[in-house]
């Protein structure tokens, strides 16, 4: 789907054509109870393009979007790979892309990247910045991560 990498000249070179066909055929195979999600690069190559792609993907009938980073152009050497990343945003630029994309779609959005503490994940969900947060390395490296995540937060059952 990336304009940086997909150089095909046929219909599969069109932005999101392959994704559209994949979504259509998957929806054909399963009933309406099947939740269909899609992991997307939020920077294709910039956040504005990711927002545009998210809206198109939503129109194809997806149930949930999982926003990560796109595969960068090897010539793209910046550490933060989007323009206009606010300096006061307390978390990673990849999480920020998910937060921004959520503002433009109606389906749930999952964010990911460098969530080290359960309080970070809770802050994102409790402030309606994201619907879900994917956590990987922190759960492996911190044996008490899940236990700490069970602490009382405003959205959790008491």
Where are each of the predicted segments found?
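Flavin-dependent oxidoreductase catalytic cores
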Residues: 1-158
């Amino acid at each position: 789907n990336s304009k940086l990498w997909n150089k095909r000249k046929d219909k599969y070179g069109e932005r999101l054509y392959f994704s559209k066909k994949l979504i259509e055929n998957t929806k054909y195979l399963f009933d309406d109870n099947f939740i269909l999600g899609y992991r997307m690069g939020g920077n294709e190559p910039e956040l504005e393009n990711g927002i545009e792609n998210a809206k198109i993907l939503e129109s194809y009938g997806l149930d949930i979007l999982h926003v990560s980073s796109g595969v960068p152009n090897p010539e793209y050497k910046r550490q933060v790979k989007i323009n206009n990343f606010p300096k006061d945003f307390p978390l990673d630029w990849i999480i920020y892309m998910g937060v921004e994309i959520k503002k433009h779609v109606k389906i749930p959005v999952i964010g990911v990247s460098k969530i080290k503490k359960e309080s970070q994940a809770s802050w994102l969900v409790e402030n309606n910045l994201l619907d879900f947060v994917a956590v990987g390395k922190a759960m492996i490296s911190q044996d008490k991560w899940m236990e700490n995540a069970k602490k009382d937060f405003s959205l959790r059952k008491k």
